[in-house]
Structures are given as structure tokens and as C-alpha cells.
Curated annotation (Swiss-Prot):
The keyword NADP does not apply. This is Putative carbamate hydrolase RutD. Keywords: Hydrolase. It comes from Escherichia coli O9:H4 (strain HS). One of its GO terms (molecular function) is hydrolase activity, acting on carbon-nitrogen (but not peptide) bonds, in linear amides. The lineage of its organism: Bacteria, Pseudomonadati, Pseudomonadota, Gammaproteobacteria, Enterobacterales.
Amino acid sequence: MKLSLSPPPYADAPVVVLISGLGGSGSYWLPQLAVLEQEYQVVCYDQRGTGNNPDTLAEDYSIAQMAAELHQVLVAAGIEHYAVVGHALGALVGMQLALDYPASVTVLVSVNGWLRINAHTRRCFQVRERLLYSGGAQAWVEAQPLFLYPADWMAARAPRLEAEDALALAHFQGKNNLLRRLNALKRADFSHHADRIRCPVQIICASDDLLVPSACSSELHAALPDSQKMVMRYGGHACNVTDPETFNALLLNGLASLLHHREAAL
């Protein structure tokens, strides 16, 4: 699996691994790269079965497999310790990494994540699956922004959304891979294991997220023994894209604080 690694800004700079959501594309984090790369060595990647890491995924593909294959390729690249920033599905992969490789994960940042899928989120995905079956990739892609962005943000950026739709359709991961990744997301349940995650965790959520209710992050915060929660009042599910200034400030401050907190505890 191919990774994209930025040059370390200084010797022994901490490593931050960015894990996107169901779309799987490393480019999702473009609004964060410039600021993160000033302080950290940043790892981005297209998840297996998407983008420049094409593959046919098994029917029983799981979050645990996503975590294992990422950890293995990081170790192969000489990276043994790393912070994880995960969005939605990426936050699930981050929690799995923290459980399975506790000596490697220094800090976890969960963006609009959850312990187990909420009934509302499941309903949203059921609607999207019906669109996929009835209208194919184009229907899935055209509906996706409705679940990601606030309405006023979309209305002011119609040409941009049209360009994003065309790009997403051209690089669509394929129906089978998408459904197998979605099923892995729906099966994931950390409600009985979250208290075993010992690394410090920053939880960021948006109160206007249409896809994942912010209450999911409150449940996550209550379940994680060493966590702090920040709420963005605006931004939707893709709040790091729609309001990068607010998000980046929260992320940079959180990473610096939690990494310092971890070092002080060692």
C-alpha cells in the first residue's frame, strides 16, 4: 500500500497519520496539510481499494484489517510511533490502532466519530445505499455533499461542487469495494472496548453534522478514559473542509497539548 510522507520539518519530528472516512482519499485532508507539515511529518494515503491503492476487497473486510494493513506499511516505512487523526470511518480505524498497537499510537484525534453506528447514521446510509443500487455511482456521488456540507456553504459553491462530483465519479472506488467498506463501518462496535484505549484522545465534532449526530462524540468522550471534546458550531460532517481555520486551530492546539501531556506522563 502506497503512502505519501512529507519531509520532517526537523530531526525526530513527531509523525501524524491522517485517515479519511468512507471515501478513502488522502486528498480529503488537503486543507490541513500546509499547517500540519510545519510542525510534523505527515502521512497521507488512499485507503486500500481506493484511489492509487486499487484492490478487490474481501466480503468480510473489517476495520481491524484496515488498521493492521496501515500499521504494517508504517512500520515498513520505518515509522514505529505516530499520532492518528481520523475522520468518521478513519476515527474507527484510529481506535482500532490504539487498541491493537498501543505502544505505537501516541495520540488519537477523532473527528465526527462514534463508538458504534447511531440509528440516524444507519438510516442515512440506508438511503444512500438505495441510491447506489437504483442510480449507480452517479446518484451516490451527487447525493454525497448533502451529507457532508451545510446547505449555505454548498449554495455558495455550486461550481466547486460540480467539479468535485466529476472528480469523485472519475475515481469512484467501485460498488463492491464501497459496500464492503461500508459494511465494515456498520459492524464496528467499540462500546465494550473503548475504556482500554489509554492514549490521550482529542474529540472534535460539529453540532450541525447531518450524518453523525454530535451526541455520538459525547458518548465517545464519556467512554474514553483520557479524552477531551471540542464542539464546532458550524461545519457539517466535513467541518475540516468547510471551516478549516477553526478546525486547524483546534487540531494544532490539541495535538501539541496531548503530545506534551503524553511525554510528561512517561
